[in-house]
Each structure stands twice: as structure tokens, then as C-alpha cells.
Regions:
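Extended non-globular scaffold/tether segments
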Residues: 221-232
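Conserved catalytic cores of very large enzyme subunits
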Residues: 2-223, 256-259, 263-266, 270-817
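A conserved hydrophobic secondary-structure block that centers on an alpha-helix together
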Residues: 244-254
Length: 817
């Protein structure tokens, strides 16, 4: 078995502080942001955006915490949440969060959104944030796409069968993520060199801006402001480190602060020189983007690839040991875990409480040669996640035919310690698919990374908008669509009806199974096309609502073209969405086909009555469907055929979609925890699922229906073409811990996974835990404080999850090998 390093006392202390911290929201940043919005309200959007960032960064409180190796925070209080406006907007904090002895409002354990979180906020901060909200509402502040909508949109919304209940909500937050910033470009150049490129263009065109160049003028001017602001942020921390050094009595700590200040001064403008500076420059840019971009999801990219040259140099020069380097990596990833962002409504529930999607990619291949790229930092990332029992960030290991067995072993051991991490991703499928589906050059395809949950993107050269630009995952709820199709277009959950032009009757009106599928195709095409149309509407508004020059300065293509990422300036552009829980719909179609059309065991009229009755009074029928009808995930072609049908239908419809920014719509079959939230608003389905129960997660089989082991799941999964899904896939499997207690067990799981990859499988993630342990954790959470599990698109501490999400994990089938 893989042997992990020990954890240093300093990292142990730091880890306990991070895990057990009280997250304090504050109004400071939102207040500064509101002041800046008023001050610069008449500026052009491209200039206004970086000017607001500059004002906030000039004035926001900063601090350096005890035991930190790296600096930079989103909030000013105890690694807090500077986005607490979301808390106040979504929650009646004044009347539902009690004030405890420390004088702060604390989130109660039964809060519907922020349950089980150690969150607190001062009454005066709540008051300030409430005043800002009320002022914005009174002024009807900002461009809000929902104020005017394309004809027919309200009819679509009323169905409540998609992520578009209302575009963006209030205030509008069009997510300029998920994405991978150009960390490698920044490390190579530094801010001063990037700024010089922009300033040279401005100097060459001073007083003579003609034709299309006015847009470029605005962009390059914004780029200079962005660079100046990033430099300012880093220098503020350098000055603070010097202040700490001046007042520090401990000689060792004093020297550390002085060295930190010197390094920060250097990387404020120049490229990093060593491993610590590289990590700090990446961290500071990450903070810069988060301060600027409230709703965005900025991932860490190919962390091991862009940091290894600096560590290699330090090791060769003898200025750093491997153990010291591991301590730095440990600290870096603990620091990432201090970033917290409260979200809005469904986003908060589906993306994970405070989850920031800082997906980190390791392994894979060298872009220029295609050779295996695994290096010592690859192992250090896994060691940090496993030894420190971290749930954030998500880590993906890119696996190819030449991936070393040692990193496989390390990955399996990590999965045993922190559920679902790393995600195992198949280079042999993804690299050629990126070229075919997205049009990437070979080197850029080999250099791909993962973002958010498990979406696929280029490394600092791509603006992928993998979940669209509006709401949730920009998708439709496929199980609700089926309920509507068999009920003459009516959603049984709310009584809303689709337009007559896409309604084909009731289940008993379809004389053949092909007629039912034709009706489903008509409804699904109308629904998904509307979803894409609403995304395109918000995409069209996007450049004047949310230009993103702070990101554009490191994104390949933007500085060359003089165009912001929101305007299509990146080298590659795409957008997309995801289909969560297709197995629920596939199993429902299989059940209808089996029970009505093939075996003729029940009439269509009676079957429909059972579904509309939420199976009440029909339990024997429901049990027969569950136990007799074949289900996806068991290597049964009868059931797998319908999953392939659903997958191909989704992909086929989506090929027609495009925006003004790009011509590529990417399909995905993943979700964060959408399947739980979607299930809450989905009526009973023909597969025997009851109203309110979760639908299947991501591209996985329905909970508990995969009963023939992992190999059977893999056979079913590869019944369709994974290469079509360049927005990402997620296949979750729960493995019983006893299966991996020996080296033979670990090797067997590795071999099964490799065989799955050889057959065209793209991704898999393993929760190595048994239901007995999870039930114990429910009863005694204090004994399982650090138990990490994978939901679908993110990992979480089991004891911090809602009861519905805990129940979903427990309900999944356990597999032995």
C-alpha cells in the first residue's frame, strides 16, 4: 500500500483551525462595492468593472492568520465570507438566527439553506447589508434580464421543469465561470509585462482610435487597471507582512514575515522565482479573481504541471527538501479551504454549502510529447487531501495508458480516506474527443483541465461557460418532461401545462412504444431549445453586465485580440449544460415498455393512475416494477437500450444550439447535488420512484438499483458513447471498505477501472464507505467529524450535509469486488 508522509505540528494546528473555524460574514466588502458602484455608475461597463475592483481592493480589510504560509482572503474576519449579502437576501436573519453570548447572529441547525454550518454575523453587519439591498431594490439597480423576457418565456417558466424558474433572481449574477485562469501565463510573465503589452497598444493609438478599435481601446485600458489592481493587492499584503515583522518578538517568525514581504514585493510585478513564490502568486491571483467575481468558479487548473518546474529548481539548488515542499502544498490546500461563499437559493443547495469548485487537475500527459506527466507534485496534492482529510478542492487524476502504478495506488488510498477523491478521468477518451467536439489543437487538447464539478476545459486558453450564463446548470428536468408527456403536457406537481403544439395525449393514447418516444422527443426538443434560447439571451446581455478583464489579462487570445472573455476573446469558446439523472427517465421508459407494450401486464390507463396517485394504493405494482423490470446499471441490454436512447436524444438535440459568442454547445451528464433538489419538485415517476425522492445522480444508475457489481455498472455505462460529453460526466460508485483492505483488493479495483477505461469509459469516482458507518455518523456526528463523501459534483463532510443528502448517500448500492 502507498505510504503517506507524516503531518507537521504546524500543519496539524492550522488544519484544526480551518476545520473548526466559525465563519463570520461581514459587510465591509459589499459596502465598498456599493460605494464604488455609485462612484463609477456612469463609466463604460468595461472600465467600470475593474475600477470597482480597484476601489474595493484599495480599502478592504486584510489580515494574516497564525500558522499561514500563504496570504490572501475573501473576507476580512477570521477567514470569513465577504459575500454575506446572500445570507441576508435569502434569510430573515434578524428573526431566525439567534444572538448568542458573543453578540453575533448564529445560523441555527434547522436553517433550510445554511443548516449545520458554523456561520455567524454581527447585527450591525446585517443592518448594513439589509440597507444596501433595500437601496438597490428601490433604485432598480443594475441590468436585470428578467425585467424583459422573450415572448413565451413565462409559459416555459410556469412548468417548473428546468433551471430557469427566474433568470438570475436578484441581484442578477450571470456566472462568468466555471473556468481555468491562465496561471501558467501569469507565472511566466508577471503583471508588469502584461500591463506593458496593454499600455504599448494604448500609446500607439493615443488620439487615433478608428473603426473596431474603440472596443480594443476599452479592453486594453481595462487591462492596465486590472494589472495595477492585482499589483496593489499583492503589495498591500507585503506591507502587512512587514508590519507583522516589525512588531514580532520571535526571531524565527520575524524572519519568516520578512521573507514573505520580500517575496510578495517581487511577485507583485514580476514572474515567480521559486516554489513558494509560484504558489503564492497563484493564490493571490485566485483571491484577486474572487474579490472581483462574486459568482464565478475559478479552478486551479493543472496545478502539478505549472508548479513542478519551480520545485524541481529548488530541489536541484538545495534550497528546499521534499518534506518542506509537502508542508507548503499542505498549507496551500488548507488555505483554499478557508475560502467560503454563501450562495443563492438552489445554487447554495445544489453546489454545496460554501463549495467554490476550485477543481485541481493532476497527472495526464505532456502537451508537446504526449508522454506521461506525473511528477512529485502530483503525489503531494493527493497526500495533502488524504492526510488532512479535506473535502475541498475536488481533485481529478488524469489517467492514461502510461500512468504509473504508484499514482494509481496513491489515488486508491486517497479514496479510502476521503470519499470520491480523486476523480479518475480517462485521457484516452477525453483528448481525442476535445479535438473532435471542441476543435482544439493537439497540444491544447493534451493540456486540458477540469473545472467546477467535473467540466472539461482548456488551460487558460478557453472560455467554456459549461453551465451556460443564467441559472443552475442550464438544463431541463428530464423526469418531469416524461411525467408531462404521459399526462398530456401537464406537470402533475403543479398543474402547469405545456403549449398544445407539444402535447400528444395521455399514456393510454400511445398505441406503440415508438409513439411514446416520438411524443417525448417532441416535448424534450421544445424544452431544451427554450433552455438554450434563454441562455443565449443572457449571453447576449453578458458583456455589458459582467465583463471580466481581471480574468482576460491571463487568458490566451484576449490580449492578442483586444477582446474580453465575455466578448469571445479567448482562443476557444463554448457553452453548455448538463442532464442530471437520466437513469430515472431511462428506467421509467424501460418499465413502461416492459409492463405495457412487451409483457402486457397492465393497461396504460391503470399504469398512469398509479403514477398520478404517487403509487398510493398500488404498492404491489410498484414493488413488481422495482424487482422484476430490468434496470440500468446491471449489464442488461434491455434496460441499457433506453439509457442509450436518452443519452443520444440529449446529444442530438443539443447539436443545433449556438450563441453569438460560440458555435459549440457541450453536453454533460453530471450534477452537484441537483438530483436531490430536482427530486423534491418532481412527481412520482413510472420507474416506481415516489414524489419528492431524489432522482438518479449524474450519469449513475438509480439509487440501489445496480445490484450486479461494479463491472456490470461499467458495462451499462459504456453502452453509449462517452466522447460526446465534453461538458463532463460523473459516475458514482460506493465500494465497501472491506473490498480494499489488502493490496490485492486495491489492485483489483485498479484493474477493473482500467478495463472500464479501455472500453471507452470516461470518468468514475469511488465512495469507499459502508452504510453502517454512515448511519453511525448520523447518530454520533462528533465521532465522524472528518468523514468525507462524494455527493455527485462535490465532496463534503458527511456530518455537515442536509438530512436529505445524507439519506441519498446511504441509499446508494454498496459494491464488493
Amino acid at each position: 500500500m502507498y505510504q503517506f508522509r507524516s503531518v507537521t505540528p504546524r500543519i496539524e494546528r492550522y488544519r484544526e483551525k480551518v476545520r473548526n473555524r466559525l465563519i463570520i460574514g461581514d459587510a465591509a466588502k459589499e459596502k465598498l462595492k456599493y460605494e464604488a458602484e455609485i462612484r463609477y455608475q456612469n463609466f463604460p461597463p468595461m472600465i467600470q468593472k475593474p475600477m470597482i475592483s480597484k476601489y474595493v481592493i484599495e480599502n478592504m480589510p486584510i489580515d494574516i492568520q497564525e500558522d499561514e504560509f500563504f496570504v490572501g482572503d475573501m473576507g476580512g474576519k477570521n477567514w470569513g465570507d465577504s459575500h454575506a449579502l446572500a445570507w441576508v437576501l435569502m434569510t430573515d436573519i434578524e428573526h431566525t438566527w439567534p444572538i448568542l453570548e458573543d453578540g453575533l447572529h448564529h445560523a441555527p441547525m434547522d436553517d433550510p439553506i445554511y443548516s449545520k454550518q458554523l456561520l455567524a454575523i454581527a447585527p450591525e453587519d446585517v443592518k448594513e447589508l439589509r440597507e444596501i439591498i433595500n437601496k438597490k431594490i428601490a433604485a432598480n439597480d443594475g441590468i436585470r434580464p428578467e425585467e424583459w423576457l422573450p415572448d413565451g418565456a413565462q409559459e416555459f417558466f410556469a412548468l417548473q421543469a428546468s433551471d430557469y424558474g427566474k433568470i438570475g433572481g436578484w441581484p442578477v449574477m450571470l456566472p462568468p465561470g466555471h473556468l481555468t485562469p491562465g496561471f501558467q501565463n501569469l507565472l511566466r510573465r508577471g503583471y508588469a509585462d502584461i500591463r506593458k503589452e496593454a499600455q504599448d497598444w494604448l500609446d500607439a493609438h493615443e488620439g487615433n482610435v478608428q473603426g473596431d478599435n474603440m472596443g480594443r481601446y476599452m479592453f486594453y485600458k481595462a487591462a492596465t487597471i486590472a494589472c495595477d489592481t492585482a499589483i496593489l493587492l499583492t503589495r498591500r499584503y507585503a506591507d502587512l507582512a512587514r508590519e507583522k515583522a516589525a512588531s514580532c518578538a520571535d526571531a524565527e517568525k520575524k524572519a519568516e514575515f520578512e521573507k514573505m514581504a520580500e517575496g510578495l514585493d517581487w511577485i507583485a510585478e514580476k514572474p515567480a522565482r521559486n516554489f513558494w513564490e509560484a504558489l503564492q502568486q497563484v493564490m493571490m491571483y485566485n483571491v484577486f479573481l474572487k474579490v472581483d467575481n462574486d459568482p464565478g468558479v475559478t479552478s486551479m487548473g493543472r496545478f502539478d504541471q505549472y508548479t513542478w518546474p519551480y520545485l524541481k529548481k529548488d530541489l536541484e539548488e538545495g534550497v528546499l527538501t521534499m518534506d518542506q515542499a509537502q508542508e507548503l502544498v499542505d498549507s496551500f490546500f488548507l488555505k483554499i479551504n478557508t475560502f467560503y461563499k454563501g450562495g443563492f437559493g438552489k445554487t447554495q443547495q445544489t453546489a454545496g454549502i460554501g463549495h467554490l469548485g476550485q477543481h485541481t487537475t493532476i497527472g495526464g500527459c505532456i502537451p508537446e510529447t504526449g508522454e506521461d506527466a506525473t511528477n512529485p507534485v502530483s503525489y503531494m496534492v493527493l497526500e495533502a487531501m488524504s492526510r488532512l482529510e479535506l473535502h475541498e478542492p475536488t481533485v481529478s487524476l488524469r489517467c492514461g495508458k502510461n500512468t504509473p502504478k504508484e499514482i494509481w495506488d496513491c489515488a486508491m488510498e486517497t479514496s479510502m480516506r476521503v470519499g470520491g477523491l480523486p476523480l479518475l478521468q480517462n485521457d484516452e477518451v477525453i483528448v481525442p474527443a476535445i479535438i473532435q467536439e471542441l476543435g482544439f489543437d493537439l497540444e491544447d487538447a493534451r493540456n486540458f483541465a477540469f473545472i467546477g464539478c467535473q467540466e472539461i476545459t482548456g488551460s487558460g486558453c478557453d472560455y467554456p461557460a459549461p453551465n451556460g450564463s443564467a441559472m443552475g446548470h442550464s438544463g431541463i428536468y428530464w423526469a418531469i418532461v416524461l411525467d408531462m408527456v404521459i399526462n398530456n403536457g401537464v406537470n402533475p406537481m403543479n398543474g402547469a401545462k405545456a403549449p398544445d403544439k407539444v402535447c400528444s395525449g395521455y399514456l393510454y393514447d400511445f398505441k406503440t412504444f415508438d409513439e411514446l418516444k416520438a411524443a417525448y422527443e417532441k416535448m424534450a426538443t421544445w424544452m431544451l431549445t427554450w433552455s438554450a434560447t434563454l441562455n443565449n439571451y443572457t449571453e447576449f446581455e453578458y458583456p455589458r453586465i459582467y465583463p471580466f478583464p481581471n480574468l482576460s489579462i491571463t487568458t490566451t487570445g484576449c490580449m492578442e485580440s483586444g477582446k474580453d472573455v465575455s466578448e469571445g476573446g479567448a482562443k476557444y469558446n463554448s457553452y453548455g449544460g448538463t442532464a442530471t439523472g437520466l437513469a430515472t427517465t431511462a428506467d421509467s421508459l424501460t418499465a413502461i415498455k416492459y409492463m405495457i407494450y412487451d409483457k402486457k401486464l397492465i393497461s396504460a390507463e391503470e399504469y398512469l393512475k398509479a403514477v398520478l396517485a404517487n403509487w398510493e394504493g398500488y404498492e404491489p405494482l410498484r414493488q413488481r416494477i422495482i424487482n422484476e423490470v430490468p434496470h440500468y446499471g446491471n449489464a442488461d441490454p434491455y434496460a441499457d437500450e433506453q439509457m442509450k436512447y436518452m443519452i443520444d436524444l440529449y446529444y442530438g438535440i443539443s447539436r443545433a444550439f449556438s450563441t453569438h459568442r460560440c458555435k459549440v454547445y457541450k453536453c454533460g451528464t453530471f450534477g452537484a447535488s441537483d438530483h436531490v433538489v430536482q427530486g423534491e419538485i418532481t412527481w412520482a415517476t413510472p420507474d416506481g420512484r415516489k414524489t419528492g425522492d431524489p432522482i438518479a445522480d449524474a450519469s449513475s444508475p438509480c439509487q440501489g438499483r445496480d445490484v450486479c457489481g461494479p463491472t456490470a455498472v461499467f458495462v451499462s455505462s459504456t453502452s453509449f458513447d462517452h466522447s460526446h460529453f465534453m461538458d463532463g460526466m460523473a459516475l458514482n460508485l460506493k465500494i465497501h471498505p472491506t473490498a480494499l483492505q489488502s493490496n490485492d483488493g486495491i489492485t483489483k479495483l485498479e484493474d477493473v477501472t482500467k478495463a472500464y477505461f479501455d472500453q471507452g469509459g470516461m470518468e468514475v469516482q469511488y465512495n469507499v464507505v459502508d452504510s453502517k458507518t454512515l448511519k453511525k455518523a448520523q447518530k454520533n456526528p462528533e465521532k465522524y467529524h472528518n468523514l468525507v463523501v462524494r455527493i455527485a459534483g462535490f465532496s463534503a463532510y458527511f456530518v455537515d450535509m442536509t438530512e436529505a443528502m445524507q439519506a441519498d448517500i446511504i441509499s446508494r448500492a454498496e459494491h464488493n469486488l
